[in-house]
Amino acid sequence: MDNDGAAAEVRTVALDWARAVVSDDADRIAAFMAADWVMVSATGIATREQFLALVESGDLTHAAMTAASEPRIRVYGDTAVYIARVTNTAHYRGRRHDADEWTTDVFVRREGRWRRVASHVTDVAPG
């Protein structure tokens, strides 16, 4: 597959991931994650297990997740890097959080499927 085709696949997977996150269905979300997936944010590193446990318990829910910029996708063989500005509305332990973030996701193609292995979020600077 050429890089354009692979980039289109990654774009589709990223959109499907956003829909899965908003569904608040831990099994559906897990289907997009590699077993060793981690998320890096201002608070540190969260593992796949930690993230999914928050979703399963209902402590973390999402009402919206929308791309706010055209993504930048680069494919390097069976690895892809996806960067986009994303807005989302989440509730964490009952408190609403509206976020405007730059996200970087690293995907690896395994057994013909693109899976997230790492995600990093950075708040967009005000102004």
What do the predicted segments below correspond to?
Residues 1-127:
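A beta-strand edge to alpha-helix "cap/lid" segment located at domain peripheries
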